[in-house]
């Protein structure tokens, strides 16, 4: 989807795209800034951007509004074009390809599913959907998901996932899968392998950055130097992603 917006003055545009028939099914939530510099060029106040939807519902609702006031008085839509998403070739192991389908189905439905156990038809993948994830003493954990590296079973927090966009849910699920797939307990290899898969599928880079910052910003009291370095590594990987399958990623 290509969108062209003409702003009358500097402001921040809010964009929200969601399934019109289901609750908590946002495919994109985005802030698009229209800064003062934009009004000094040859085409003042005009900006184009693309909203990719490698995964979309039958009825997609698109809302655009002024982030400050919630109205549409400060801009007009000059372009709104639909384009077919090009087919993409994704390099991954056969079980990862099967997991992609399972993860996409769960990510789409997680906003309205009740808690419980959800598994794939072949029984290879299982998600335990919990109100919140707890430690052995019953204390709530801030993590949105965690993986048993021996079985591949994933625990997911409904409290967290119900607030995330569908792409953010996929970033988390792909990350968790690679803890089992590699296998590794280290965050960086799981981060980068999961992100590569997410980006290879054609999902938006912006939502990948949101996934990282949103999760850590939700609990700033737990963010340390290691977390900040992790965010830098992730953002650097996203910025330098070329779409070329790199089988020798430096993730050690």
Annotate the PLM regions.
Residues 86-95, 159-161, 178-185, 221-223:
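Second-shell loop/turn segments in exported
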Residues 2-132, 251:
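A metal-dependent hydrolase signature that marks the N-terminal structural subdomain at the beginning
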Residues 110-123, 182-186, 201-213:
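Surface-exposed patches in mature extracellular/periplasmic domains of secreted proteins
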Residues 159-163, 176-189, 193-205:
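Catalytic Zn2+-binding segment of zinc metalloproteases
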Residues 203-252:
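Long, well-structured alpha-helical subdomains associated
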Residues 165-171, 210:
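Alpha-helical scaffolds flanking conserved acidic
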Residues 128-166, 177-180:
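Active-site scaffold of zinc-dependent metalloenzymes
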Residues 96-104, 174, 187, 191-195, ...:
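Extracytoplasmic/secreted envelope proteins and their assembly/folding machinery
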């Amino acid at each position: 989807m290509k969108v062209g917006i003409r702003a009358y003055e500097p402001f921040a545009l809010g964009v929200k795209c969601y399934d019109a028939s289901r609750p908590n099914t946002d495919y994109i939530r985005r802030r698009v800034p229209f800064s003062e510099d934009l009004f000094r060029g040859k085409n003042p106040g005009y900006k184009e951007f693309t909203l990719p939807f490698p995964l979309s519902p039958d009825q997609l609702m698109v809302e655009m509004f002024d982030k400050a006031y919630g109205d549409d008085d400060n801009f007009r839509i000059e372009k709104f074009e639909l384009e077919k998403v090009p087919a993409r070739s994704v390099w991954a192991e056969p079980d990862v390809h099967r997991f992609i389908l399972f993860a996409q189905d769960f990510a789409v439905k997680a906003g309205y599913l009740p808690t419980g156990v959800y598994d794939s038809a072949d029984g290879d993948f299982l998600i335990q959907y919990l109100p919140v994830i707890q430690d052995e003493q019953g204390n709530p954990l801030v993590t949105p998901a965690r993986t048993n590296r021996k079985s591949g079973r994933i625990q997911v927090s409904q409290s967290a996932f119900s607030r995330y966009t569908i792409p953010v849910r996929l970033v988390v699920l792909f990350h968790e899968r690679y803890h089992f797939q590699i296998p590794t307990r280290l965050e960086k290899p799981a981060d980068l392998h999961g992100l590569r898969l997410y980006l290879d599928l054609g999902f938006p880079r912006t939502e990948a950055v949101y996934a990282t910052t949103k999760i850590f910003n939700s609990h700033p009291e737990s963010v340390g130097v290691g977390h900040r370095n992790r965010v830098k590594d992730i953002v650097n990987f996203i910025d330098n992603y070329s779409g070329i399958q790199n089988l020798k990623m430096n993730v050690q």
